[in-house]
Amino acid sequence: GATPVISVHGMGGSGLYLNPGTEDEQQVGVFDAKSLLSRGGLIQNVLAAVGGKQTDPNTVIDQIADLMNDYRNIACDEDGNSIYNVGIANYWTDSLKNHPGYLSGTSNEPAICRQVAQNIGADKVYAFNYDWRLDACETAAKLADFVDQVKAKTGKKQVTLIGSSAGTVILSAYIDQYGDRGDIRRLVMIDGALTGVSVTKLFCQDLLFDADVVKKYLDRVTTSYHNPDFDFS
């Protein structure tokens, strides 16, 4: 029979929930257009910059900081642990045959799994869901346990791993820590973050917007927008 396939998604591939598994469970960290549109001042300043008008970068920085507060629930502490009781709600150890709703999704990973399922059967396709904010090496250890479960259920000694975007970081950590187990039949990396990622400080809210850098960025936006070689129609 076919080798079982495990999909490892990228950032945002699993929804994050405050108080997961409780009556108070609610999804957090989801980009909401209303959140941006409610900041009329920020939009106005960016559009003004595009139009070639002078914009105070410090004002823009304050407006960005205010926008980021809408996503403070997904913040981590300096040790990389979630500050709030936030985690994933869906951790499936069974195949996607039992999760048709996922296979009908329109984002990247469900579409990949759907195509694979059409070729080998959904009963041989699995989705490894994880909290994409947390340590890649610790997540790789969880993936190793997941791989063991899939091998035990299918009777196969090897699996095919498909990583998308930041999921390739998890696969890199898996290869580094568990590559000598010899349980990878095939490895597929899609849009791989092969040089690593540097987002830890973002989740710890340890970041700095320099006024000069913001001003230069806005200037570049203006230059690009008015460049005849770019077609924005």
Which ranges hold each PLM region?
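Alpha/beta-hydrolase
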Residues: 226-233
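N-terminal non-catalytic accessory region
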Residues: 1-162, 166-224
